[in-house]
């Protein structure tokens, strides 16, 4: 929608996109839901004066970042616990026995990561030279990251010392062996909406008028971006301490990441030269 005001011009644009994942099982929280993404843009163009063309614009929008296939349908979790590993000089008398656990590692509460972004931009053109600067901010309160959980898995630990190897005529029978009841305590992970991401930055671009003597235009563009990752989801961690060659059977619960900050700045230069006689344009950057 364009609205002229004297010699000024206002332009307003609005749009909406609807997203949904089809074919999900009813166990998924996303099943049957529609996620709307709204976008609003406003531009104010000033009157052209003495070769100066100036405009200001701003935008606000939301976007839903859908989980990937690997996040929606992770592999089943398998854990093998060795109960007996008996070695005999006669290969026919050797035996290994394991307890295997299998479970579904899917997080059915997973939802799209919702990103909100706003930006303001200034564009200035003068006699074939153009400069644009954009400042933006983004925020996601439910970005994807690992969530941890622990499980205690019971198994029998058979004592190889209770086997009389000289009397064997076949692999040892488990029912005739002594054992102790043990359990394995460990930490596992799956995907969840537990990460908060805040991002802000400045993007810029300058394109010069083509220098007639060199038939060359200079373009410079780049950005500065700061990103902060924060997760208040507690994290489980298994003990790495061994006592009598056995893992210390404790699990610790720790606070989530209080904030990790990263910053990046990059600038690029590009020179494109037009050779009219050959009808060719060469670009270097």
Residue ranges and their predicted role:
Residues 24-31, 69-75, 82, 144-150, ...:
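Outer-membrane beta-barrel translocator domains and adjoining extracellular loop/strand segments
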Residues 1-46, 115:
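Surface-exposed extracellular loop regions of Gram-negative outer-membrane beta-barrel proteins
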Residues 14-20, 42, 56-62, 71-73, ...:
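Transmembrane beta-barrel strands of outer-membrane/channel proteins
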Residues 6-12, 158, 162-285:
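Gram-negative outer-membrane beta-barrel transporters
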Residues 2-9, 44-50, 64, 114, ...:
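Outer-membrane beta-barrel strand-turn architecture
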Residues 64-140, 161-170, 183-209, 260-263:
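Outer-membrane beta-barrel signature, preferentially recognizing the C-terminal barrel domain
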Residues 1, 21-26, 41, 85-87, ...:
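Extracytoplasmic loops and strand-loop junctions of Gram-negative outer membrane beta-barrel proteins
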Residues 1-5, 40-44, 60, 110, ...:
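Residues on the lipid-exposed face of transmembrane beta-strands in outer-membrane beta-barrel proteins
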